[in-house]
C-alpha cells in the first residue's frame, strides 16, 4: 500500500514509499499537473469551461485554413489547420472541458488528414489517422482513409489488416470491401501470383 503525503507549501502530493509502481507515479504526476493548473485559477466562481479567447483563435485559424482550401491554396490550408490543431492540443488548460476538446480535435484532424491525402503527404496522414483511432474515433471512414493511405505507401499487409478491422465493425461498408479486394490484388501481384 502506498502512503501519500501532501505538501501544503507546494500544494503537491508525493508517495512516501521507496518503491512505487509506475502507474501510481504517473497518476500522482497527473494529479499534481491538474492541481497546479487549478490553483492558478483566480475566479472564485470557477467552473471548468474552455477559454473563449483561445477557442475563438483556434476557430479563426481553422476557418482561415478552410478559406484557403476553397481558394485552392492547399499548402497554406494545411499549415493553418495544423496550427489550429497544435493550439487545441497544447495551449488548452488540462482542466478545460474535455467533452468540448475531443470533438473539436476530431473534426479538425479529419480535415487535416484529407488535406494531407490530397497533397500526397501519406506518412503524415497515417500518423494522424493512428492518433484518431487512438482517441476512440472508431468509424468506417477512418478505416477507409487509413487503408487507402497504406495502399499508397505500399504497405499491403497492414492495409489488409486495416480493412478487415473496419469490416469487423461495418461488414456492409462497400468502400472497405473494395479496398480489401484491391489490397488482395496488390498482394497477389507483389507475391508473383
UniProtKB/Swiss-Prot annotation:
Localization: Cytoplasm
Chief location: cytoplasm
What cellular-component terms does GO give this entry? endoplasmic reticulum; rough endoplasmic reticulum membrane; Sec62/Sec63 complex; translocon complex
Species of origin: Saccharomyces cerevisiae (strain ATCC 204508 / S288c)
Which gene name does the record give? SEC72
Subunit text: Component of the heterotetrameric Sec62/63complex composed of SEC62, SEC63, SEC71 and SEC72. The Sec62/63 complex associates with the Sec61 complex to form the Sec complex. May interact with protein YLR301W. Part of a complex consisting of KAR2, SEC63, SEC66 and SEC72.
Q: Which InterPro entries match?
A: TPR-like_helical_dom_sf, TPR_rpt
Metal-binding keyword on record: no
**Keywords from the UniProt entry:** Cytoplasm, Protein transport, Transport
| Protein name from the UniProt record | Translocation protein SEC72
Q: Which domain of life, per UniProt?
A: Eukaryota
User: What's a single GO MF annotation on this record?
Assistant: protein transmembrane transporter activity
Q: What does this protein do?
A: Acts as a non-essential component of the Sec62/63 complex which is involved in SRP-independent post-translational translocation across the endoplasmic reticulum (ER) and functions together with the Sec61 complex and KAR2 in a channel-forming translocon complex. A cycle of assembly and disassembly of Sec62/63 complex from SEC61 may govern the activity of the translocon.
Amino acid at each position: 500500500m502506498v502512503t501519500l503525503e501532501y505538501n501544503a507549501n507546494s500544494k503537491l502530493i508525493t508517495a512516501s514509499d521507496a518503491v512505487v509502481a509506475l502507474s501510481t507515479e504517473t497518476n500522482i504526476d497527473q494529479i499534481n499537473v491538474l492541481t497546479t493548473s487549478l490553483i492558478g485559477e483566480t475566479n472564485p466562481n470557477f467552473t471548468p469551461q474552455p477559454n473563449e479567447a483561445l477557442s475563438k483563435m483556434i476557430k479563426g485559424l481553422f476557418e482561415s485554413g478552410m478559406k484557403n482550401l476553397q481558394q485552392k491554396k492547399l499548402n497554406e490550408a494545411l499549415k493553418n489547420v495544423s496550427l489550429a490543431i497544435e493550439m487545441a492540443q497544447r495551449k488548452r488548460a488540462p482542466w478545460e472541458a474535455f467533452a468540448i476538446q475531443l470533438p473539436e480535435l476530431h473534426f479538425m484532424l479529419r480535415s487535416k488528414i484529407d488535406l494531407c491525402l490530397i497533397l500526397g503527404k501519406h506518412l503524415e496522414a497515417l500518423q494522424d489517422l493512428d492518433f484518431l483511432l487512438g482517441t476512440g474515433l472508431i468509424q468506417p471512414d477512418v478505416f477507409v482513409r487509413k487503408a487507402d493511405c497504406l495502399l499508397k505507401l505500399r504497405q499491403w499487409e497492414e492495409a489488409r489488416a486495416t480493412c478487415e478491422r473496419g469490416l469487423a465493425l461495418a461488414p456492409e461498408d462497400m468502400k472497405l470491401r473494395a479496398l480489401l479486394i484491391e489490397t488482395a490484388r496488390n498482394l497477389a501481384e507483389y507475391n508473383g501470383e
